[in-house]
From Swiss-Prot:
EC number, UniProt record: 2.1.2.9
Organism (species): Coprothermobacter proteolyticus (strain ATCC 35245 / DSM 5265 / OCM 4 / BT)
Protein's recorded name: Methionyl-tRNA formyltransferase
Primary enzyme class: transferase
UniProt keyword list: Protein biosynthesis, Transferase
Length: 304
């Protein structure tokens, strides 16, 4: 099958690799190289890096205008897959009968429409999420549903552990999609239920408010497990990557920590947390036991 694969982020990488393994003829359409890192050097998108390694043809774009549209329809694609792309898809593309265009969205639509569904589902304390394959529409993530599958969110799941589960389900749903398309059984149905939106995290949302309940802070840390939820210790930035609800009595004021043996506990607005993994500015990421060994003060305040 000849596939146009529209992607600029990381979520679609395992799907791209699996499609290549299954010997589909793929062309990657991705964003042009963008400045990144300390030196702001031009860097290719993550899919472009993978595609180059797999010898997949790459088309880099900064918009999808007339020249691109003409090229696109001249290629004889059977299917167009859109996942974590970052550009508006023109109506000429998504309304065409061929190639059939499908968008992979990692939520149970209509819940968590928008660019950040995985983090938002975790941060909201959801017990389940999923993957939905939809038609592209003029309004973001409002297209009819081809296929949908639920995925349980385990209590210990965070962004790092949940994302691969959703990527695996995405590929399994695509296989079903290809089969139904081949058999002429592909159908789509309207989204039902109350919609919600999943915007990107604002800079303020990356910081921990220790006045919030322990459960809410735990969910925030789980949602930011790859980048770390921010706080401070004195003048130093601290990123927290993993916590759990502590069995300690509510004796610690919000933000106040105490180090006991190899454990680190911190008070919140309701309950307390045990910090398991963190990184202080200028140091490597550490488990709590290693961090505690280097602490001069066994009691203090985060975010103070």
């Amino acid at each position: 099958m000849k596939i146009a694969f529209f992607s600029s982020g990381t979520f679609g990488l395992p799907v791209l690799e699996e499609l290549k393994k299954e010997n589909h003829e793929i062309v990657l359409i991705t964003k042009v190289d963008a400045p990144s890192g300390r030196g702001l050097k031009l860097q290719p998108s993550p899919p472009a890096v993978v595609a180059e390694a797999l010898q997949i043809p790459i088309v880099k774009v900064n918009s999808l205008k007339n020249d691109f549209i003409e090229w696109y329809f001249s290629q004889g694609f059977d299917v167009a897959i859109v996942v974590d792309f970052g550009f508006y898809i023109p109506k000429q593309l998504f309304q065409a009968d061929k190639p059939v265009m499908v968008n992979i969205h990692p939520s149970l639509l209509p819940k968590y429409r928008g660019p950040n569904p995985i983090r938002r589902a975790i941060c909201s304390g959801e017990l389940e999420t999923g993957v939905t394959l939809i038609k592209i529409s003029e309004k973001m993530d409002e297209g009819d549903i081809y296929l949908q599958e639920r995925v349980l969110i385990d209590p210990d799941d965070d962004y790092v552990s949940l994302t691969p589960k959703l990527q695996h389900v995405s590929m399994e749903l695509l296989k079903k999609f290809f089969l139904e398309l081949k058999q002429g059984n592909l159908r789509a149905f309207p989204q039902l239920g109350d919609p919600s939106y999943a915007p990107k995290f604002t800079p303020d949302e990356l910081w921990i408010d220790w006045q919030k309940p322990a459960h809410d802070i735990q969910n925030q840390v789980r949602a930011l497990a790859d980048v770390g939820a921010k706080t401070t210790l004195g003048s130093k930035l601290v990123k927290i990557f993993k916590v759990r609800i502590s069995g300690m009595e509510d004796s610690l004021p919000p933000g106040h920590y105490v180090a006991e043996k190899e454990s680190l506990y911190v008070g919140t607005g309701q309950g307390s947390l045990e910090i398991l993994s963190l990184q202080q500015e200028g140091r490597k990421k550490q488990d709590a036991a290693s961090f505690v060994k280097g602490l001069r003060e066994k009691e203090g305040v985060f975010g103070g």
